């Protein structure tokens, strides 16, 4: 019997890890990866950090260059897909080539959510999703230049830190009343706000751009009435899923390809993962997780489901952010208001814990990354703690 053919569409973390997971889990059939980028699949997190700060930055490949040939994965880089061929099981490229598939994994990622007022600036306005974006930003982030960043989420703050370290004059504009409001607990939000302000970043909360004039400098008029002059304008206000191919194939979409708990779409032969995917929960709500680890996890889950294998046991959600000399790691549930703090954030070393009825459900470490491993185990096991002991620095965490 002829083995099935699996095609992966995409060139990022989820796509590469889907290929790796399929081979690791025993798939020996024909495996193809199609990407519109000419690079081998590369890591996205460094784009806002090391790619802007290092003297001679290099793209960090998700898998070694020789892995693809050694594992008999056919790479098709720099190509554009015309149709997925859901009915015919024939993927068609714009150059006329067609490729048969039995199962499909879509990991086309996402673009920056548009901001028309700034997009009208053309090349004077920047977003950050790809290696080319980072290269363009690196050229313009020069000392003493005035940089305005719209959006104080993870990407916005990482860019603010990198631009400041490149000796730019940075202002961040945020519509909400806080920074990193979507994915950090309140005490961490407060710490980050103060950290950036101490570094010289001006952060304008509860504000937005109302009018833009393009001249020698970009003139930005805010809702507050203030006018800013900028050499460089960057924005990061969320994502717009690259779902067009899926939508044209009549898959369920909602600013993302709708998947179930095993990454399967409404077509049992088509799976999706990474930033392009949005999961329908048991209660019917849609949930998207934009992180490096989620891309890896969904690739593993989809590979197992495609091969009819038991699903891997996944750790609690985890992501990290590097800002200035700080490394922050977020694990577990970030919701809730009653966070405990171990250590002193003013010394740039602390851990915030989220206890629910004594059970540890989430944590954030500040320059304490070595503690993530035991914390992960505690969250997975539902370990209970005495709050006083947990925050007592005289008691080693490993002894609890």
UniProtKB/Swiss-Prot annotation:
Domain of life the protein comes from: Bacteria
Sites where the protein binds NAD(+): 146-174
One function term, GO molecular function aspect: 3-phenylpropionate dioxygenase activity
EC numbers for this chain: 1.18.1.3
Keyword Signal: no
Pathway(s) the chain acts in: Aromatic compound metabolism; 3-phenylpropanoate degradation
Signal peptide start and end residues: none
Entries under InterPro entries matching the protein: FAD-oxidoreductase/Apoptosis (IPR050446), FAD/NAD-bd_sf (IPR036188), FAD/NAD-binding_dom (IPR023753), FAD/NAD-linked_Rdtase_dimer_sf (IPR016156), HcaD (IPR023744), Reductase_C (IPR028202), Ring-hydroxylating_dioxygenase (IPR053382)
Keywords of the record: Aromatic hydrocarbons catabolism, FAD, Flavoprotein, NAD, Oxidoreductase
Swiss-Prot/TrEMBL GO biological process terms: 3-phenylpropionate catabolic process
Catalytic activity of the protein: 2 reduced [2Fe-2S]-[ferredoxin] + NAD(+) + H(+) = 2 oxidized [2Fe-2S]-[ferredoxin] + NADH
GO cellular component: cytoplasm
Stretches assigned to coiled coil: none
Binding residues for FAD: 5-36
Required cofactor names: FAD
Family that this chain belongs to: Belongs to the bacterial ring-hydroxylating dioxygenase ferredoxin reductase family.
Listed PANTHER family: APOPTOSIS-INDUCING FACTOR 1 (PTHR43557), RIESKE DOMAIN-CONTAINING PROTEIN-RELATED (PTHR43557:SF2)
Subunit structure: This dioxygenase system consists of four proteins: the two subunits of the hydroxylase component (HcaE and HcaF), a ferredoxin (HcaC) and a ferredoxin reductase (HcaD).
Protein task: Part of the multicomponent 3-phenylpropionate dioxygenase, that converts 3-phenylpropionic acid (PP) and cinnamic acid (CI) into 3-phenylpropionate-dihydrodiol (PP-dihydrodiol) and cinnamic acid-dihydrodiol (CI-dihydrodiol), respectively.
Name listed for the protein in its UniProt record: 3-phenylpropionate/cinnamic acid dioxygenase ferredoxin--NAD(+) reductase component
